[in-house]
Amino acid sequence: SLLCEMPGGHFITYPKARIQEIDGRDTLTALKANWTPAADDKEWPRFKLWGGLLAENVTQAFAAALLRNAIRQTEDVALHCHDELALEVPTGEAEAAANQLQKVMEQAPEWAPGLPLLAPPSIMKRYGK
């Protein structure tokens, strides 16, 4: 397997990665671990690993780790969507909750010191963009 260690200590894993010739070119591939092969397939399907995909995977994993870090430090999380957290709090507590959420989401984790983060909150009666 090919492993990419992330700053927070977790890994992105590409199972049974190997270089194989595809269309006359050496190509890095890995198993589609989240894919079930057809009953008559002789092996698990593979997918091509290329620079753009690897960069996207690292970027998304980093963003997900930041969001998980914020979720662990926040109470009253009603939902999360991509890079957003939504809290459900009484109206009278909304301003304080928004300020606290902004503080948590803009604080870089210990594994990413100095990372500039900006997370201005919105107070809404219903979730929206």
Regions found by a protein language model. Name each.
Residues S1-K129:
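Conserved catalytic core of nucleotide polymerization and phosphodiester-bond processing enzymes
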